[in-house]
Amino acid sequence: MTSMIDTIHEHSSGSFPCSTPVFVPHPTDNDATSHHAKPQGLLLIWDAPNLDMGLGAILGGRPTAAYRPRFDAIGRWLLDRSQQLSEQLETRIEPEATVFTNVAPGGADVVRPWVEALRNVGFAVFAKPKLDDDTDVDPDMLAHIRRRHSEGVLKGIIVASADGQNFRDELEQLATTGIPTTVLGFHEHASWAVASETLEFVDLEEIPGVFREPLPRISLDNLPEEGAWLQPFRPLSSLLPGRP
C-alpha cells in the first residue's frame, strides 16, 4: 500500500507557500503548566494512515503526482471555513491544521521531506514511532480533540478520516453540544458519516485544487458499458490473524 509520503504534491515545486497563515500549536502546548491564552479555534485532524489506505484503494496502487492531495489547497479551504465560522459566531476563529502519522523504524529520512513540506505550509505534525502493528495514532488524535475541548477553545472540528470506529461517537457527542462537526474523506469509505444526521461530510474531491485530475473512482452507480473492476478496500492478507 502506498505511503502518505507519496500522497503529497511535490514539495520542491513551490506548491507550498511559506506565507499561508494557518495556526500552528504553540511549542508550549506540550507544557502542562503553560498559561498562554489560546485562540478560539477550528481544528483539523488529518488521519494520515487511514486516508493513505483509502486513496490507495481507490487508485489500486501508488498515486502519481496528479493524484496526490495538495495540502496548500487544503490549507486554503480550512482558512475559508474558519472565516465562515468567524462570521457565524461573530468572533475571531483561528484554524489549527494538524496531521497525525506513524514513522516506521529506519524510515525517518524517507518521511522527513514530507513532514517538512507540511510544516512549511502551516500544518503541525504529530509523528509517532511504528513499533508494532498495535502502535497507531488513534488515541493521540482523540486526546488532542479532547484537550482542545477541555480548554474551551474548540469552536469547530474537522476530522479527515474514514475511521468511524475511532471517531464516530466522539464527533457525534461534540455535535450534540452545538460544535460544528465535519468529516473529510472519500464517500466510498465513510458511509457512517455520509448517512449521519448530525455530522457534515465533505468529499476530498469537492475541495478546489486538491487533486490535479479527477480520481478514477468507479462505483455500482456509474459503471462504464464495458464493466469495471471494483478494487478491494483492504488486502486479502488482512484476514490473517495479526494482520491490519
Feature roles, as predicted:
Residues 2-135:
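Domain-level signal for Mg2+-assisted phosphodiester chemistry and nucleotide/NA-binding surfaces
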Residues 107-243:
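Nuclease catalytic cores that cleave nucleic-acid phosphodiester bonds
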